[in-house]
A protein has these predicted regions:
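Bacterial N-terminal signal peptides
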Residues: 9-21
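Sec/Tat signal peptide C-region and signal peptidase I cleavage site
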Residues: 22-28
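Second-shell loop/turn segments in exported
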Residues: 34-42, 122-131, 170-178, 209-211
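Soluble non-cytosolic domains of exported or imported proteins
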Residues: 39-47, 130-138, 178-181, 216
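Secreted/periplasmic proteins that engage bacterial cell-wall peptidoglycan
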Residues: 67-171
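...with weaker cross-activation on analogous glycine-rich loops/strands in unrelated enzymes
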Residues: 154-241
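Low-complexity, Gly/Ser/Thr/Pro-rich intrinsically disordered linker/tail segments
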Residues: 242, 246-356
């Protein structure tokens, strides 16, 4: 006699077998290709993310993966190579400085960068300024101005607008949070402290921000452009690997950062012997700036627009003496060369004086 299991029991066995199968994880995807065209969105957070993403696309989409490896960098900040938007790299950085209103005119070479709107001459002084001067805060300020964010004052220093958010929360577009207790969303910013000799974290940075002496501090902030709980947060920052670079950080299923990689002060140096020290995501992540809801942003004063700077027109350059390779400008003739008489053959030497 053949024994047959009841049909309901067979169904239970089938469901149990399915439960033992691994659950497929949703594949994380870069949100920037879809976002970069939404710069005219009525939603301010979307506009912020869109301008940041469009800039990353212009730099050929370099990125830092979840393990902190930098990839895809094709063009560097001071090169004359064209970006995907046909603007030379050094010119694009000068545009971030100029259009954000943060160009420090007192610094060497900065004044020549102000001519970017009227001249495409590859100024060596401007390019030296771009190499020597961190421009990540200028990039953030450029994005926020393009997006029309109210309650945000751009600055050449990240610390200035972080301190402003901390001290003036009711008049600011951002609210300060500990990055380990906040859920990142598009339009937010995640910031770390650049101090090799000390780890700050949220509490020590908060103490510095509240101090009356206005102490300076090197910082860096990335703009959140996407967040996929259980997968990754996507952030875009300027002057990262000398480009505008996308960064990926792991997110837990609840939307919080999952084990945010943080420096400890005893991390190994980056070397072939200790590659674990080469993680570009390993930083002193100290503060998150949380974008306020749209209804609250609408009550803030409109974004500050500085008065237009009158930039004198550069004289047209017909030739150069200290020529830059690839500029397309011809070299000036030597000053001791005699002019060729009109109508004579330049290939033949002029006859000596007094010769008939």
């Amino acid at each position: 006699m053949r024994f047959r299991l009841p049909a309901p029991f067979l169904c239970l066995l089938a469901f149990a077998a399915l439960a033992l199968l691994p659950v497929p994880q949703a594949r994380a995807a870069d949100p920037c290709p879809a976002l970069r065209t939404q710069t005219a969105s009525p939603d301010i957070a979307t506009r912020i993310a869109a301008y940041a993403c469009d800039a990353n696309n212009a730099w050929y989409r370099p990125f830092i993966d979840l393990d902190g490896r930098v990839s895809g960098v094709r063009t560097y900040e001071a090169e004359a190579s064209p970006l995907a938007n046909s603007i030379q790299a050094w010119q694009q950085v000068a545009i971030y400085w100029n259009d954000s209103g943060t160009l420090p005119m007192g610094r060497a070479g900065a004044s020549e960068c102000a001519y970017i709107a009227t001249s495409r001459y590859p100024s060596p002084s401007c390019r030296a300024f771009i190499i020597d001067t961190p421009w990540s805060a200028a990039f953030v300020s450029w994005v926020m101005r393009r997006a029309g964010l109210p309650g945000f004052s751009g600055s050449a220093s990240h610390l200035n607008y972080v301190r402003d958010a901390y001290r003036n929360p009711l008049q600011n577009a951002y609210q300060v949070q500990d990055p380990r207790s906040g859920k990142p969303a598009p339009g937010d910013m995640l910031c770390y402290v650049r101090a090799a000799s000390r780890i700050y974290g949220f509490s020590d940075l908060a103490a510095l921000l509240s101090a009356p002496n206005g102490e300076g501090l090197g910082m860096h902030c990335d703009i959140v452009v996407g967040a996929q709980p259980g997968n990754a947060a996507y952030l875009v920052g300027g002057n990262v690997a000398q480009a505008v670079t996308l960064r990926m950080l792991r997110l837990a299923p609840n939307g919080y950062f999952a084990s945010l990689p943080t420096r400890t002060g005893s991390d190994p140096a980056c070397s072939p012997d200790t590659p674990q020290g080469c993680n570009s995501n390993l930083q002193d992540w100290s503060i998150m700036l949380k974008l306020r809801p749209a209804a609250e942003l609408a009550l803030l004063p409109p974004p500050y627009v500085p008065p237009a700077t009158v930039v004198p027109q550069l004289p047209s350059q017909q030739c150069c003496t200290a020529c830059v390779v690839g500029s397309g400008i011809p070299r000036c003739p030597a000053s001791n060369m005699s002019p060729v008489p009109q109508g004579s053959d330049p290939a033949k030497p002029a006859p000596p004086s007094g010769t008939p």
